[in-house]
Amino acid sequence: MKVVAFNGSPKKEGNTYQAIKMVTDELEKEGIEVEIVHVGNKTIRGCMACNGCARNQDKKCVMSNDDVNEWIAKMDEADGIILGSPVHFSAIGGTMKSFLDRAFYVGSSNGGMYRHKVGAASITASNIKCSI
């Protein structure tokens, strides 16, 4: 069994990573192969809703100048998927959102690629007050 975990935090080993790591450590104890992918420090364009993935039916986004297609392939090959993100301004991080929009569009356009996978999410938040 293989699980891929995506860290949507810009901080490589911040709180989101620590939460994901707690889960993946337990999975590894059970003999499950685990890979953590750091998404949050990348530049990812959002989905353009061009329908190219639906037309091509190749399990890829037509935008190929970033790591998203590699990550989609990892999700397709995995038995389980963990998504981790900090909360920024009441939502998941922008990079993670862009990645997920594209991955889910590709997945739903290619026969529901992730339909029978085990999934989990980890959201981290802080109570730091800031004035804007």
Question: Regions from the language model: what does each represent?
Answer:
Residues M1-S109:
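N-terminal beta1-alpha1-beta2 submodule of the flavodoxin-like/Rossmannoid cofactor-binding fold
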